[in-house]
């Protein structure tokens, strides 16, 4: 994490927004008129938001984040644009409510930058890092009632195996789940180090030497479960498209295959004619709602990855709304 020399935010809280130039390039055509509204649904530390409001001088930005600390830091970073920025401390699945409360019927652009922010990764107290010995928390929103420790110590072996297999794509899910249940019968598992070492011991020795840290997939799975990451994304993508005005644009940055596949499936379905097979003519309400702006998922350049290794897993997809989904049949 390095500081932007042009920013007034302390270096410790400044991050490098991923693929920021491409994000701005894709959003800007929708933001060229006074009063255009762009939603940064995951404002985080404000890096993308700052670049967008700087480039789109007539636009207003609404930034959402479920982490109150992130909102405070983003407010610092965006202080110079305070007259054009509203920050709201809610998760992005409250998008419809946020717009309704402000009397906004449609927006020009929406950005989602999914996954962990630098703020979460770099704060050991959050319990996301398997390389540290800290409480097993993993909540992006500290107000959530359930921690990773709660999941590990209360889910059945079957439930744990499902979480690890589905959200972590962990091939040793059953072995790890059984090991967790045996260990917690003696003593609750409460720290990241305890869980990390347990996972390492549970999987076969040859597998420990390949594919990165042995606990990587387990930690990913627990994080997704605790924060309902995929559920929120699946619920919110249709809401986001409904909120876009025709000609509006949506950009999504994802960081693991489960997120990217969810976005890919949704975009492809919305960009396809949904007329049932066998009908003699296409249904007007089944016409494509989106036009894809990216050919597949775009990746960061080698230069960006070299400067910011955390960008390496990023996948970017974008689309433009071409039909008002609220039109009459």
Curated annotation (Swiss-Prot):
SUPFAM superfamilies in the record: Putative methyltransferase TM0872, insert domain (SSF81799), S-adenosyl-L-methionine-dependent methyltransferases (SSF53335)
Molecular function per GO: rRNA (cytosine-N4-)-methyltransferase activity
Principal subcellular localisation of the protein: cytoplasm
Region (Disordered): 295-329
InterPro entries: RsmH, SAM-dep_MeTrfase_MraW_recog, SAM-dependent_MTases_sf
A GO biological process held by the record: rRNA base methylation
Assigned GO CC terms: cytoplasm
Location of this chain's protein in the cell: Cytoplasm
Pfam families for the chain: Methyltransf_5
EC number: 2.1.1.199
Chain sites annotated for binding S-adenosyl-L-methionine: 46-48, 65, 92, 113, 120
Keyword vocabulary terms for this entry: Cytoplasm, Methyltransferase, rRNA processing, S-adenosyl-L-methionine, Transferase
Top-level EC class as recorded in UniProt: transferase
Family: Belongs to the methyltransferase superfamily. RsmH family.
Function: Specifically methylates the N4 position of cytidine in position 1402 (C1402) of 16S rRNA.
Protein name: Ribosomal RNA small subunit methyltransferase H
